[in-house]
Amino acid sequence: CNSACFTCDASYSTKIGSLTNKIYPVVDNSNAYWNLPLERVVHLDINGGEPSASKNYKRILQNLPPNLKSLRLNTNCSLVIEELEDIVAKGIDVTVTVSLDGIGDVHDYVRWPIKWDKFYSNLMIYKSMNVKLNTWTTVSALNIRDFKNIIKFVKQNKLEHSYAFLEKPDVLSVKYRNKFTSACAGQFDLVATQRNNNFELEAFLEEQDKVRGIDEALR
């Protein structure tokens, strides 16, 4: 993956792994896919890492199963997967799910180092494609205050939207009271309903900012 989202970890993101460990091992298990009876595959669901930044995923998209009817993939919208146009032209139903975890500066912090301007530009390219486009928000302490802006954005741009509440890392859960969630108590039933975790949250963010080389003033 080419992103080091604060809601992710090194087991999913090679970007985070490379920041935390210079000898971070990258395991290529793509043979497990190619050894499947691909002629029996009619639907393919591609999850992260980031498909647009993976050579393995690109190879899969260029050599899809012969009887494939539908394809869904998620993306952080840092890049455009241009192969999708050709896939649609083959009569395959394509759904693109874009991770939308904030607007503007909130996006840039939560989904570091992906920049909002690039994200938005690529999102509009996907919107112009002949694909089914939807957006997904993982609601955490870092973006709960921006959730209303996210809803406004998807409505203005006529985008399908779904969301779920983050469970891990637990320190970023909206269930705790802290400087981010307290102002949003009542927005959802579970927001800021449990103990104050400001101390743990600050320690977590300081460590994560340091790993990414982010000035804490941007938080």
PLM regions with names:
Residues C1-P25, P37-L38, A192-R219:
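N-terminal pre-core extensions flanking Radical SAM catalytic domains
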Residues D9-D28, E39-S54, P66-E82, K90-S121, ...:
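Core AdoMet radical
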Residues P25-N35, R59-I60:
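Helicase-associated low-complexity regulatory tails and linkers flanking the ATPase motor
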Residues N35-L36, V88:
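A general structural signal for stabilizing positions within well-ordered secondary structure
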Residues N56-Q62, E82-V88, D146-K148:
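Distinct, well-ordered alpha-helical segments
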Residues L61, R111-K115, N149-I151:
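Short secondary-structure boundary/capping segments
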Residues L64, I87, Y126-M129:
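Hydrophobic helix-cap positions at the C-terminus of alpha-helices
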Residues R72, I92-T97, D117-R219:
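Conserved C-terminal portion of the radical SAM core fold
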